[in-house]
UniProtKB/Swiss-Prot annotation:
Keywords of the record: Developmental protein, Differentiation, DNA-binding, Homeobox, Neurogenesis, Nucleus, Paired box, Transcription, Transcription regulation, Wnt signaling pathway
Organism from which the protein derives: Xenopus tropicalis (Western clawed frog)
GO-annotated molecular function: DNA binding; DNA-binding transcription factor activity, RNA polymerase II-specific
Chain intervals with Polar residues compositional bias: 290-306
Name this protein carries in UniProt: Paired box protein Pax-3
Segments for region (RED subdomain): 113-171
Length: 461
């Protein structure tokens, strides 16, 4: 940056006199060392320094009186990990002194009584003169060696306290009172009970019923509710608290599973295969589709193409089938909107006199079949529109070519009981150019329900 003439350039970074608040650090507490911090429980600690010995003594004493570690942690405001580690080390070694972090656990080879004897022997006899004492006892008792040992012992006592030997060597306390008040050498002589694994609690039916009723009222009972419930169910308050914690976890798991099942029902592809009923395949002729050769083309099995069409459960209509299993077979054609129309091989005549039948179609049928079809012209009409069918391509016309399709409910026709296998047909109107089903305003065909009709045998036609 360019500055004006005579202006003093300013530094972009702040000077040393500017103090900015530090973020991301714990709250500092005014301690003699100025390094105190506060843990989550509100206790003051110094990072990197071991816990003071008087707090360690208090932890061991409270554990000796049967107080749980979690309660000790809250009362002394010491983290639970620190409490458990001190107690575990005291149970293993009998010592509360801070040790090195990590490494293998010290093995308890000697008892605290033996360790005390060893410490007393070390205080009475320095390390450098142990070998000479052993030699004097078991070897030749030279007076010179004894005098040298005494001189070394006197010199060691006169050493300064600030020397390395004076710091590392443990000094003997002056009196028992000072031993009790010592924060370094004293070890609590309190036996701790080994933590035994508690057997799994078994609840009776009455206890479970009482707990479930309380869980229906509230998922998070307070201390008064838990104590009252523990008295009624003859349990401890701690067992009631643990039961509610486990019950809430099980309730959350069940709620998540129910939501997943409800979501799967909303997805069409999530239906199980058992919910999709198996339907027979329909047969559609691929040959030239002349009006007079419709029965022969459909009845010829050599020129047919099988197209299986699965149906969703919502569009399948169960119907009562006739007693003769050979009298009918359902054949369905798909549409673009999951609608399905029946496709059969005989024609149904118009229901009124104003709807004449195509002469070419009528000439291809026998008088007996025509008589049977004209006798059932008074069946009530059930209008149902669906996509049109193109027999040449085997597909569907666009939605504009909508035609009245046959419904899919089966009704047993009394006049066709004598026929072993019969199949009826709802005729579409065929144009001369496309041979497709097109809507014609003058034609209205009677509907016989919502299932397929009986096919007529080829030998009758």
């Amino acid at each position: 940056m360019t500055s004006l003439a005579g202006a003093v350039p300013r530094m972009m970074r702040p000077g040393p006199g500017q103090n900015y608040p530090r973020t991301g650090f714990p709250l500092e507490v005014s301690t003699p060392l100025g390094q105190g911090r506060v843990n989550q429980l509100g206790g003051v600690f110094i990072n990197g320094r071991p816990l003071p010995n008087h707090i360690r003594h208090k932890i061991v004493e409270m554990a000796h009186h049967g107080i749980r570690p979690c309660v000790i942690s809250r009362q002394l405001r010491v983290s639970h990990g620190c409490v458990s580690k001190i107690l575990c080390r005291y149970q293993e070694t009998g010592s509360i002194r801070p040790g090195a972090i990590g490494g293998s656990k010290p093995k308890q080879v000697t008892t605290p009584e033996v360790e005390k004897k060893i410490e007393e022997f070390k205080r009475d006899n320095p390390v450098s003169s142990i070998s000479r004492i052993l030699r004097s006892k078991f070897g030749k008792g030279d007076e010179e060696d004894i005098e040298l040992d005494r001189k070394e012992q006197e010199e060691s006592e006169k050493r300064a306290k600030h020397s390395i030997d004076g710091i590392l060597r443990e000094r003997a306390p002056a009196s028992p009172e000072s031993e009790e008040g010592s924060d370094i050498d004293s070890e609590p002589d309190l036996p701790l009970k080994r933590k035994q694994r508690r057997s799994r609690t078994t609840f009776t039916a009455e206890q479970l019923e009482e707990l479930e009723r309380a869980f229906e009222r509230t998922h998070y009972p307070d201390i008064y509710t838990r104590e009252e419930l523990a008295q009624r169910a003859k349990l401890t308050e701690a067992r009631v608290q643990v039961w509610f914690s486990n019950r809430r976890a099980r309730w959350r798991k069940q709620a998540g599973a129910n939501q997943l099942m409800a979501f799967n029902h909303l997805i069409p592809g999530a239906f199980p295969p058992a919910a999709m009923p198996a339907l027979p395949t329909y047969q559609l002729s691929e040959t030239s589709y002349q009006p007079t050769s419709i029965p022969q083309a459909v009845s010829d099995p050599s020129n047919t193409v099988h197209r299986p069409q699965p149906l969703p459960p919502s569009s399948v209509h169960q119907s009562s089938l006739p007693s003769n299993p050979e009298s009918s077979s359902a054949y369905c054609l798909p549409s673009g909107r999951h609608g399905f129309s029946s496709y059969t091989d005989s024609f149904v005549p118009p229901s009124g006199p104003s709807n004449p039948m195509n002469p070419a179609i009528g000439n291809g049928l026998s008088p007996q079949v025509m008589g049977l079809l004209t006798n059932h012209g008074g069946v009530p009409h059930q209008p149902q529109t669906d996509y049109a069918l193109s027999p040449l391509t085997g597909g569907l016309e666009p939605p504009t070519a909508v035609s009245a399709s046959c419904s899919q409910r089966l009704e047993h026709m009394k006049s066709l009981d004598s026929l072993s296998t019969s199949q009826s047909y709802c005729p579409p109107t065929y144009s001369t150019s496309g041979y497709s089903m097109e809507p014609v305003t003058g034609y209205q065909y009677p509907q016989y329900g919502q299932s397929a009709f009986h096919y007529l045998k080829p030998d009758i036609a």
